């Protein structure tokens, strides 16, 4: 595998260059702004391209050395896309609500994850010994915990890198990452503060098509990292994803 490719045309078609209304801008974004049209800031895609490439490389490199990447996007138009990207690339995600202390108070979060696992076990069986009402209450508790923590249930500890959609909405997540020294990759729109972000990607953070494009590229970069890690461990990645080799073709390899 290799880092995912993308073109300037794809960025344009997804509306990555459209910022917010000019009166809503953050002056710190001035270096990333190309101009304005109809009172809307236009972001400079000639900067987005190399910065997005750098972000994809850091995601791939992090995963290749066995690191974990946490995707964060809780706004309505990002929620499903973030979860899909996390699942597809064997990474982790928060897509409902960022709970304060999710990273900085990992011990408490771990206890809640243990409770979620326990509920999974209880409800996977027949849940014998519970009344209908008790079972319903357990299901509700499980649903609430799964919504908040399902995407990080198997993470094991704090991540090595975070990828964020909407730095204003996810300000608490960024603060916690900074406190723990976790590097942050994030899309920065014209109303964002780029100073907080280690690997900024100047672009629209509201349009569903733009969000889908970023998440697809980040997920594919993570998959590239997995392939590189497995290659370094001597695992034949092709054998895992391709159809089984014909027995007749295997014979020479066995004798080699």
UniProtKB/Swiss-Prot annotation:
> Which keywords label this protein?
Ribonucleoprotein, Ribosomal protein
- Known InterPro entries for this protein? Ribosomal_uS2, Ribosomal_uS2_bac/mit/plastid, Ribosomal_uS2_CS, Ribosomal_uS2_flav_dom_sf
Q: Which Pfam family is one of this chain's hits?
A: Ribosomal_S2
Its cellular-component GO annotations read: cytosolic small ribosomal subunit
Report which superkingdom the organism of origin falls in: Bacteria
- GO MF entries: structural constituent of ribosome
Q: Which GO terms describe its biological process?
A: translation
The record lists the membrane-crossing segments as none
Q: Which PANTHER family match?
A: 30S RIBOSOMAL PROTEIN S2 PROKARYOTIC AND ORGANELLAR, SMALL RIBOSOMAL SUBUNIT PROTEIN US2M
Q: Which family does it belong to?
A: Belongs to the universal ribosomal protein uS2 family.
Protein name per the record: Small ribosomal subunit protein uS2
Recall the taxonomic lineage recorded for the source organism. Answer: Bacteria, Pseudomonadati, Pseudomonadota, Alphaproteobacteria, Hyphomicrobiales
């Amino acid at each position: 595998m290799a880092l995912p490719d993308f073109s300037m045309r794809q960025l344009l078609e997804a509306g990555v260059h459209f910022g917010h209304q000019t009166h809503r801008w953050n002056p710190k974004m001035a270096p990333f702004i190309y101009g304005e049209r109809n009172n809307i800031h236009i972001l400079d895609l000639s900067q987005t391209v190399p910065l997005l490439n750098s972000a994809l490389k850091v995601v791939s490199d992090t995963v290749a050395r066995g690191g974990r990447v946490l995707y964060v996007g809780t706004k309505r138009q990002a929620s499903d896309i973030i979860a899909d990207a996390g699942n597809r690339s064997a990474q982790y995600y928060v897509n409902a609500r960022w709970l304060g202390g999710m990273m900085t108070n990992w011990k408490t979060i771990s206890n809640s994850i243990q409770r979620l696992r326990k509920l999974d076990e209880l409800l996977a069986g027949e849940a014998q010994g519970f009344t209908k009402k008790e079972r319903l209450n357990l299901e509700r508790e499980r649903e609430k915990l799964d919504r908040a923590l399902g995407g990080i249930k198997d993470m094991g500890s704090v991540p090595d890198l975070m990828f964020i959609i909407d730095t204003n909405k996810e300000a608490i997540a960024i603060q916690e990452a900074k406190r723990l020294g976790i590097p942050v990759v994030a899309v920065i729109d014209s109303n964002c503060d780029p100073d907080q972000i280690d690997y900024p990607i100047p672009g629209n953070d509201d349009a569903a098509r733009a969000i889908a494009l970023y998440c697809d590229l980040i997920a594919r970069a993570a998959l590239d990292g997995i392939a590189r890690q497995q290659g370094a461990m001597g695992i034949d990645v092709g054998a895992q994803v391709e159809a089984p080799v014909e027995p007749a073709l295997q014979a020479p390899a066995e004798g080699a």
